[in-house]
Amino acid sequence: DAMFLVGETRETPMHVGGINLYTLPDDVDEAEWLNEQLALLRQPQGIRRPFSEVLKLTPLGQYGPIRLEPDRDIDMHYHVRAAALPKPGRYREMFELASRLHSGLLDRTRPLWEITLISGLPNRQIATYTKIHHALMDGAATIHFTNSMLSPDPAERRA
């Protein structure tokens, strides 16, 4: 995992990103739903590792061993964001936004992830763009984690 930190540059970021699309039921108010989801996702209690942990380096910096330690002051408003697409809110604008969000490096003084809820899409759709550093979780683990969060079985869901 340390190699992903050593090899990272502005030109070669070492994070993975993904977009998920969700269609809201007709009887759900989009603005109300978004506000509820933001409030829910921004609650720091119950957030599990590695999302609650911050990178700690030894005196050798990124070339030495790395470890993750609990971030006791995690700023969930920093990690969980909202963005509204300009009208008419096409998928092209969503992908342009995701590209801009993906282009910046993650702040190594904070837990190495961000999620953005994206509104303004057609057909009552909402998107999430998630960015996670590869040192924290690889692509396969990210897919497994996302699938477990979205499971219809509450016993399998975790956040």
Predicted features along the sequence, with ranges:
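Non-catalytic N-terminal regions of enzymes
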Residues: 1-159
